[in-house]
From Swiss-Prot:
GO molecular function: ion channel inhibitor activity; sodium channel regulator activity; toxin activity
Disulfide bridge positions per record: 2-17, 9-22, 16-29
Source species: Orphnaecus sp. (strain Sibaliw/Philippines) (Tarantula spider)
Expression across tissues: Expressed by the venom gland.
Described purpose of this protein according to its UniProt entry: Voltage-gated sodium channel Nav1.7/SCN9A inhibitor.
Keyword Secreted: yes
A GO cellular component entry from the record: extracellular region
Location in the cell: Secreted
Protein name per Swiss-Prot or TrEMBL: Mu-theraphotoxin-Osp1a
Family affiliation: Belongs to the neurotoxin 10 (Hwtx-1) family.
Keywords linked to the UniProt accession: Disulfide bond, Ion channel impairing toxin, Knottin, Neurotoxin, Secreted, Toxin, Voltage-gated sodium channel impairing toxin
Length: 33
């Protein structure tokens, strides 16, 4: 699953984590196993 942290991510948590650029750039987008 995926957890998105912070309001600064303009994408939903799942979409943000699927986007590696976003998830690496924004530390609040994190994967959870």
């Amino acid at each position: 699953g995926c957890k998105g942290f912070g309001k600064a991510c303009k994408y939903g948590a799942d979409e943000c984590c699927k986007n590696l650029v976003c998830s690496k750039k924004h530390k609040w987008c994190k994967y959870t196993l």
